[in-house]
Amino acid sequence: VDEVLRAVWTRFLPDDPPGLALVAVGGYGRSELLPHSDIDILLLHQNDALQLHRTALEQFTAFGWDIGLEVGQSVRTIEDCAQEAAKDITVITNLLEARQLTGDPRLIQEMQAALTPDKVWPVRAFFEAKKAEQAARYRKYDDTGYKLEPNVKESPGGLRDIHTVAWVARRQFGSGTLTDLRERGFLTKQECDELFAGQDFLWRVRFALHMITGRRQDRLLFDHQIKVGELFGYIDNDRNRAVEQFMQLYYRTIKSLSCLNDLLLQLFEEAILGSDELLQVSPLNARFQRRGQYIEAVDDEVFRRAPWALLEIFHLLQLHPKLEGIRAQTLRMILRDSRLLDDGVRRDVRARSLFIEMFREGRGLTRNLRRMNRYGVLGRYLPAFGKIVGLMQYDLFHTLTVDEHVLYVVRNTRRFMMQRFADELPFAHEVVKRLPKPELLYLGALFHDMAKGRGGDHSELGADEAKTFCLDHGLSHADADLVAWLVRQHLMMSLTAQKQDVSDPQVIATFAGKVGERSRLDYLFLLTCADIRATNPALWNSWRESLLTELYNTTARALDRGLSNPLREDELVAEVKAEARQLLVDLGETVDGIDEVWARFDADYFLRHTPDELAWHFPALRAVSPASMPLVLVKTLPERGTSVFIYTLDRDHLFGLSTGVLARLGLNILDARLHTTHDGHVLDTYVVAETDNRPIDPGVRFPEITEQLRKVLSDPETSTVSVNRRVPHRLKHFDT
């Protein structure tokens, strides 16, 4: 590209006039071009030269486009560059990477002289702006690079993290290559090699994306992951698909790059923002001290003398929440010495005590585990966890890698304990107060998916590992059994609530028998809620919450009565009727009038609807006549979502037509309860939501739903419903 642009320049400006220069900037200035990258150039000029050669420059630009170069061009004087750079961090960043292509060499030298730190963007201000820019970029990606469709360039741990380090180094030292940083002592040889290897890997991934898509593409979408994995030579094996193996390498690479980004920015901060001599130092214990707002080891050999201190430093961070992080040199020691966490250290009572104490402490646990994972300590101490680091779950539901998902589940269990998050799940916030040992819930969360990716039943394998871990770490047999049971059964409550009829007394009796006692029900309910919420934000809604809460409450009643005295159907029906009857009497209905309407329906109707729903249905059911059918009611019920109730004569195709109408209206059907009466009518209830989980607008959508259903169900024999819903791109890659 350099040679092409120089040739085009020479064609239209053969005399190479003074006062004009062609300069590469941005990624092109860094000499980082991929097949479909933007080619960013700067036409640097003096005012009189631009006027003299305007026509030739316009021809140069037009010809570049004509021959297929995707050129992004700016035209500026040196004064323009200085003014724009002073106002915008992105402009100064772009110009830092300026590289002369052809033309008057004096101009780029004068521009660089006008942009030195003593004139615009002092080193400290530049560094702080770049840190803020990176933090904002991280927030855009929810502070994780481990989502299942990452951006190779912009996600945390991506190429932009390497660029950020280079920009800060260039601003501070005048040169920003990795080799320069190594020569200046900011990088060890191993760190430099890791950065080069990670950068090369991500470049190759981006190159593959450009070749596969035929355009600029930086996101590793599901469409492309399989093809890129094939280009990298991966094939399916007994345990993991090729795409999962490739993506695990990707996630582990960005994890390494993210650690090095942390390390280098911390080193820069210490070098740029102040002298160590000015920071107050106070001892924390014989191995660690506080320097300013950071923790550091007292010398370079701490972890080699006491490898268990690799856990102690994180425990100290947990005990001293005002500490902002780990000093750079100590972080470098952690990255260097984490390999010392071998079987001997894992058996050391000091290591075991420190690790389990983090869970008993509770406060700061999530942040600590994330740090330990980020710096490789968690996977070293728990080899089973190390195996799931970066492991993707190529399915319709999970949005994070297994290790990130597990840590989000731990986070959710911790949030149940915190008053400031009580409004997220008020019922769970109340249940968690009854736990005698919350640390057992956190351990269940940590181990619940730790055996994924090995083949076999991950719940069974994980339960065995959890029990061994708990006993090794000094927990009682009863506590170890509880954690193992939680891991083994962590899917049971979700599957029961979503795939079985929780209004059926037999379902409740069976589930209660498997749970056995109220305390286990509390733990399992909380783990289930935390797990679903961490799997995919779109999976959690008021309907699922209500199902789990209903299952919890009915099971709690069954356990309180005793497993030998299960709830009977007639008792449940009588209770529901009594509560609904009271609601209606309070509204002015008579008992005889209520019972007369209800006589048309059998027990299933009362078992499958709440008292509030029965009270809502009643006035319409009392007034309905053959001429007014089909009866269609729509209402948003507290904590259950939007309910659509249909009452009409039983005829063929009603279910297909009803669901077809709802699908055509762009609604997701979350639940369907279908009931046929003994006198030939149907009572069908659907719980629906917008596809993006937005609340359904009563003013617009309720009349639309009612009108469309009544229109189609009025003549089901001749009605047809065609549904043509766009399939989200993610679903196209799975068998559904």
Predicted feature descriptions by range:
Residues 2-24, 31-33, 37-398, 467:
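Non-catalytic interface/linker regions that flank or bridge core catalytic/transmembrane domains
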Residues 96-150, 501-517, 521-551, 555-558, ...:
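Long, amphipathic alpha-helical stalk/connector segments used for oligomerization, subunit docking
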